[in-house]
Swiss-Prot record:
GO terms for biological process: peptide biosynthetic process. It is found in: Cytoplasm. CDD domains: S1_EF-P_repeat_1, S1_EF-P_repeat_2. Belongs to the elongation factor P family. Involved in peptide bond synthesis. Stimulates efficient translation and peptide-bond synthesis on native or reconstituted 70S ribosomes in vitro. Probably functions indirectly by altering the affinity of the ribosome for aminoacyl-tRNA, thus increasing their reactivity as acceptors for peptidyl transferase. This is Elongation factor P. It comes from Lysinibacillus sphaericus (strain C3-41). Keywords: Cytoplasm, Elongation factor, Protein biosynthesis. Gene3D superfamilies: 2.30.30.30, Nucleic acid-binding proteins. InterPro entries: Elong-fact-P_C, NA-bd_OB-fold, Rib_uL2_dom2, Transl_elong_fac_P/YeiP, Transl_elong_KOW-like, Transl_elong_P/YeiP_cen, Transl_elong_P/YeiP_CS, Transl_elongation_fac_P.
Amino acid sequence: MISVNDFRTGLTIVVDGQLYRVLDFQHVKPGKGAAFVRSKLRNLRNGSVNDKTFRAGEKVEKAQIDNRKMQYLYAQGDEHVFMDLESYEQTELASSAIEYELKFLKENMEVHIQSYQGEMLGVELPNTVQLEVTETEPGIKGDTASGGTKPATLETGLIVQVPFFVNQGDVLIINTEEGSYVSRA
């Protein structure tokens, strides 16, 4: 058990039998009445984000999340196959469980798979990934002076806004949290 006073961003807890990750929290001490903790929680099973208020000092169960390093192998219909790098055991995850992460996954990429009591929860991506541009308008000389952007389709199907000097075939570094262009690789 952990006190809500000890909340921190990224902490995984169990509330009412549901598994949540703390996205944001704020300790509130009103002038009148008891202190409380206002929090924003993401349900790890269905992805919904909920606001929940706890009384100061209230205890919640801390969840033990297992992180295993795995390699993304391939997609088979609606399932995606990952291989444990230590035991070579293969695990399948449904597309619906990793819908956002699929925009950044490419074959043979190493990721961390999160599980709770044997139940696979999802994929933890690295902060940045390198993806190749498969389609974009060609850059025209002199375009960089205006500092504008254009859409580019990457090898995973993700569409990001990139500077005019980026061309088809370039490898880009993409921020996985925001889904945005960082730089050329």
